[in-house]
From Swiss-Prot:
It comes from the Bacteria. The lineage of its organism: Bacteria, Pseudomonadati, Pseudomonadota, Gammaproteobacteria, Alteromonadales. The gene is ispE. This is 4-diphosphocytidyl-2-C-methyl-D-erythritol kinase. ATP binds at P96, M97, G98, G99, G100, I101, G102, G103, G104, S105, S106. It is an enzyme of class 2 (transferase). Transmembrane segments: none annotated. Pathway: Isoprenoid biosynthesis; isopentenyl diphosphate biosynthesis via DXP pathway; isopentenyl diphosphate from 1-deoxy-D-xylulose 5-phosphate: step 3/6. Catalyzes the phosphorylation of the position 2 hydroxy group of 4-diphosphocytidyl-2C-methyl-D-erythritol. PANTHER family: 4-DIPHOSPHOCYTIDYL-2-C-METHYL-D-ERYTHRITOL KINASE, CHLOROPLASTIC. GO terms for biological process: isopentenyl diphosphate biosynthetic process, methylerythritol 4-phosphate pathway; terpenoid biosynthetic process.
Length: 286
């Protein structure tokens, strides 16, 4: 592949905790979470074209291009701004789909940010985040680009700085439907609200974890295995799990012993998204 291609990072995230506090009249869940951005993820490349067509050159198996959040994000920005240009898009897919680490939402956010720059739309990050909310509740956190304490349906974001840890992220090779988890009658929905100042990893949890472990034996077994090495938890609605380490080498040592039927990677937490680092390098961030 052409080494001159300009790749834009599309980082993963972890939910270091996920508390479900209730349900709104519209059916959405009231929640609190801590979004930790990671330094690894997918990559996207964009070639601006003079015609308005949006073309994803590297489609994802099982996902029609029309349903891909990358294409949806590009068209949403195009429609919102009246931009007459289009683009060809390439994707280097690293993150698992349906894993709870934000792959699709991150792809959408990077698309909005990159094309806002390349098409010279001049929208602010706040405007892009508001636009991105129509694509998914997690898109704004990737657009705003900070590790953040989230409330509401996940759209009320308070940027925070936390001690950066090393994480082993493990995918037990099964797909967990977010909709099925959130619609499950036995999902806890009454965890008391906390303030950011009260946050402590050991005093928080993921309200979706037990339900998913009850339904997916390989998630439960992999979590038990991880807990032998370090504090561990499910992220989002799964199926990805993570273990927390103080050094990269500790995480790599455990990765080397990963059980069969799982895949994984080691990553470091970052307070600022790699895509924001790229924007800063280009001299364009607001």
């Amino acid at each position: 592949m052409d080494q001159t291609i300009d790749w834009w990072p599309s980082p993963a995230k972890l939910n270091l905790f996920l508390h479900i506090n209730g349900r709104y009249p519209n059916g959405y869940h009231q929640l609190q979470s801590l979004f930790q951005l990671l330094d690894k993820g997918d990559e996207l490349a964009f070639t601006v074209t003079p015609h308005a067509e949006i073309t994803l050159l590297t489609p994802i198996d099982g996902v029609a291009n029309e349903d891909n959040l990358i294409v949806k994000a590009a068209r949403l920005l195009q429609t919102h701004t009246g931009c007459s240009e289009g683009c060809d898009i390439q994707l280097r897919k690293v993150l698992p789909m349906g894993g709870g680490i934000g792959g699709g939402s991150s792809n959408a956010a990077t698309t909005l940010i990159a094309l806002n720059y390349l098409w010279k739309c001049n929208l602010s990050l706040t405007e892009l985040a508001e636009l991105g909310l129509a694509l998914g509740a997690d898109v704004p956190v990737f657009v705003m680009g900070n590790t953040a304490f989230a409330q509401g349906v996940g759209e009320q974001l308070t940027p925070v700085n936390i001690a950066q840890k090393h994480y082993l992220v493990v995918f037990p090779e099964c797909h967990v439907s977010t909709a099925e988890v959130f619609n499950a009658p036995d999902l806890p929905r009454n965890t008391p609200l906390i303030s950011w100042q009260e946050y402590d990893f050991d005093q928080t949890h993921n309200d979706c974890q037990q339900l998913v472990c009850n339904r997916f034996e390989n998630v439960a077994n992999t979590l038990r295995w991880l807990l032998e090495y370090a504090p561990s938890r499910m992220t989002g609605t799964g199926a990805c799990l993570f273990a927390v380490f103080t050094s990269n080498q500790e995480a790599e040592n455990v990765l080397a012993n990963l059980p069969s039927g799982c895949s994984g990677f080691v990553s470091k937490g970052v307070d600022v998204s790699p895509v924001h680092d790229k924007l800063a390098h280009l001299g364009s961030i607001s």
